[in-house]
């Protein structure tokens, strides 16, 4: 009986091995095999993707190098063409490479269309490049759609602070009331704070202005708003009134700092029914333009990399400034404001002036690569003749 069972086990194992071998042979027989019929050089020609379909392979087509959908705004330069045979069919393929030559290989010509790729930003959900001189957009992406803007909101707050200071040196030295238990608690919060408010200590308008601009301190921004208008609620009403006076139809504020009400309620500073400030990229750019026009000192103040304020280091997270990772001398960036909350994502308002060009203001909202995409956006803006000084 045992020997019979063993016999059947051996037969079953042989069947499985035979079946497995058959499957293996079948896969090998049906595997894609491309052979080269002819190859010729061609004049270097620019192409870009026709749609999201298609991929770049090695010439034997047994290794994928890149999918076109992951390179939505790339220009591919073709230098060779070949006729490749696959089974009974033949097709014309181009040997292409991106500008840097870091990605190259063969692709069926039908996946491409002649000409350089139109400019675009891959990550920013909303963006704009504005000519500061004319106030006209030179490039935009969903720029009229309002969305949360995090600490970029402080540009409006700082405008109203500078409006009240009105160049008066003595006003800068006025002491701001920072005794609120909510603001003191916020200043100690690792996620919502920034510049520490010490109980029984006094801070001037200038100190809180630097903390709000450079360190993006939320408690400093709220305290300044209360100093300007008398209360947090009145200041937010003033923010909205200012937006209305500028005809910003896609701007609505509920926060002086840019924090959402879902965070502010823990400190007693929630206001209104909406959760967040909702502003379009275009309206953010217009706020920045008004700020620079009326109070150009914001460029000098905003270009400071770091500053010790009342014994605390205020670090400017604008990494496009001189000496920082994303600095480019040709772009000459001298401002303006970063922002982040999980809801708003990474946001950045940049500005600079290239030699012989008008000043540019750029806005990218909810952009995980806010600095590299701002670099690209500024370069694109300067490529338009309308930006010439």
Regions found by a protein language model. Give the residues of each.
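Boundary regions of SH3-family modules and the immediately adjacent low-complexity/disordered segments
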Residues: 33-37, 97-117
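Residue-level detector of high-confidence beta-strand sites
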Residues: 67, 106, 137-140
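Active-site-adjacent loops and short helices of periplasmic peptidoglycan-processing enzymes
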Residues: 117-279
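Hydrophobic beta-strand positions
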Residues: 56, 129-130, 352
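Beta-loop motif signature
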Residues: 30-95, 99
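Penicillin-recognizing serine hydrolase domain
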Residues: 120-124, 226, 230-389
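Sec-dependent N-terminal signal peptides of Gram-positive bacterial secreted proteins and lipoproteins
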Residues: 2-30
């Amino acid at each position: 009986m045992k020997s019979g069972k063993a016999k059947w086990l051996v037969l079953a194992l042989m069947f499985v091995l035979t079946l497995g071998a058959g499957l293996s042979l079948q896969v090998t027989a049906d595997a894609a095999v491309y052979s080269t019929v002819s190859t010729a050089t061609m004049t270097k020609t620019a192409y870009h993707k026709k749609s999201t379909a298609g991929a770049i392979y090695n010439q034997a087509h047994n290794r994928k190098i890149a999918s076109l959908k992951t390179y939505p705004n790339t220009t591919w330069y073709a230098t060779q063409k070949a006729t490749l045979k696959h089974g009974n069919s033949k097709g014309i393929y181009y040997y292409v490479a991106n500008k840097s030559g870091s990605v190259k290989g063969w692709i069926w010509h039908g996946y491409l269309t002649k000409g350089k790729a139109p400019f675009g930003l891959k990550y920013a959900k909303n963006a704009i490049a504005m000519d500061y001189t004319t106030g006209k957009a030179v490039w935009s992406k969903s720029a009229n759609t309002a969305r949360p803007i995090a600490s970029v909101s402080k540009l409006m707050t700082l405008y109203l602070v500078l409006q009240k200071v009105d160049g008066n040196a003595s006003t800068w030295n006025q002491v701001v009331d920072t005794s609120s238990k909510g603001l003191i608690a916020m200043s100690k919060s690792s996620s919502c704070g920034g510049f520490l408010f010490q109980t029984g200590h006094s801070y001037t308008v200038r100190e809180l202005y630097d903390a709000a601009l450079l360190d993006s301190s939320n408690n400093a921004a709220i305290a300044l708003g209360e100093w300007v208008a008398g209360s947090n609620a009145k200041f937010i009403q003033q923010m909205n009134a200012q937006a209305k006076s500028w005809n910003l139809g896609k701007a609505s504020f509920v926060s002086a700092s840019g924090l959402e009400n879902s965070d502010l309620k823990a400190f007693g500073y929630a206001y209104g029914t909406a959760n967040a400030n909702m502003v379009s990229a275009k309206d953010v750019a217009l706020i920045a333009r008004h700020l620079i026009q009326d109070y150009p000192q914001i460029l000098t103040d905003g270009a400071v990399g770091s500053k010790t304020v009342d014994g605390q280091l205020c670090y400017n997270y604008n990494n496009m400034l001189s000496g920082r990772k994303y600095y480019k001398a040709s772009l000459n960036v001298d401002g303006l404001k970063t922002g982040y909350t999980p809801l708003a994502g990474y946001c950045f308002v940049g500005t600079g002036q290239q030699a012989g060009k008008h000043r540019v203001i750029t806005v990218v909202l909810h952009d995980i690569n806010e600095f590299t995409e701002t670099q690209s956006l500024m370069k694109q803006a300067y490529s338009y003749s309308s930006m010439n000084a």
